[in-house]
């Protein structure tokens, strides 16, 4: 898990630097814990990997006051987990779904677990 954490941290910091992200911006995560483990997408979902990735990103992004949005899988129509505060700020429509590891994906499930006040929105625009 330490290797995954280090790779996530490195990638996040590089993206933030190149994008010139600032406080209040939204960093969107989409991906597959199965692929991180070297398997076909959706075939070996890992809650442990999902939690490690999300917790690592939150550690970095919260310090910079950047929101994390986490895309779910096709089972929840690729809806995005965000903090309620962001959904209200930007007037995103909240949908009624709670991600699960095999119906939403491990990243969205971890986000729903670790966010302060998580909600799920249909899409982000802007």
Model region roles, listed by residue range:
Residues 64-126:
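Ligand-binding beta-strand-loop-alpha-helix segment within the catalytic cores
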Residues 19, 32-34, 43-46, 96, ...:
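Generic serine detector
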Residues 1-27, 43-60:
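N-terminal glycine-/serine-/threonine-rich phosphate-binding loop
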């Amino acid at each position: 898990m330490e290797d995954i954490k280090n790779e996530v941290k490195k990638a996040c910091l590089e993206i933030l630097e190149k994008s010139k992200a600032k406080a209040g911006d939204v960093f969107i995560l989409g991906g597959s814990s199965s692929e991180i483990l070297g398997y076909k997408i959706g075939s070996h979902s890992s809650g442990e990997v999902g939690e490690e990735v999300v917790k690592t990103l939150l550690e970095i992004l919260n310090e910079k006051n950047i929101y994390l949005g986490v895309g779910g899988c096709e089972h929840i129509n690729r809806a995005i987990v965000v903090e309620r505060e962001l959904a209200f700020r930007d007037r995103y429509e909240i949908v009624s779904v709670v991600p699960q590891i095999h119906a939403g994906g491990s990243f969205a499930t971890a986000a729903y677990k670790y966010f302060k006040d998580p909600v799920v929105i249909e899409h982000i625009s802007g």
